[in-house]
């Protein structure tokens, strides 16, 4: 865990002890994050599948995100993401907080207090 925190320091613009790592494929690493950073807050920011896929399609990512340039691949990837998150909820109950984008933008006060 310490090595991850140290190595990601170069990508952060602040020295605060927390940050958000929001790459699209982080969901596959929930178990590892829980093991190496047991106090980490794991937030699953969800959005309507269409909006999520379209947002990924329009974003120019760095290496490793080639699936975002094809809508059919995005649809398959989204389904895999959804199934993987169901798995994490089963094996790590209460460790992942689902935050729904649509609810957050309509009621930020309530949603911001959930965590």
Predicted regions: what is each one?
Residues 1-2:
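Conserved nucleotide-cofactor-binding alpha/beta core module
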Residues 5, 10-114:
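PAPS-dependent sulfotransferase catalytic domain
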């Amino acid at each position: 865990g310490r090595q991850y925190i140290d190595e990601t320091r170069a990508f952060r613009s602040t020295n605060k002890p927390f940050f958000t790592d929001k790459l699209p494929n982080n969901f596959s690493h929930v178990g590892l994050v829980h093991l190496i950073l047991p106090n980490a807050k794991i937030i699953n920011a969800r959005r309507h599948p269409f909006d999520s896929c379209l947002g990924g399609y329009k974003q120019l990512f760095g290496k490793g995100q080639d699936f975002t340039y094809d809508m059919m691949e995005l649809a398959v990837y989204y389904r895999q993401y959804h199934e993987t998150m169901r798995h994490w909820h089963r094996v790590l109950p209460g460790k992942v907080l689902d935050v729904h984008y649509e609810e957050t933008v309509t009621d930020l006060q309530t949603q911001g207090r959930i965590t």
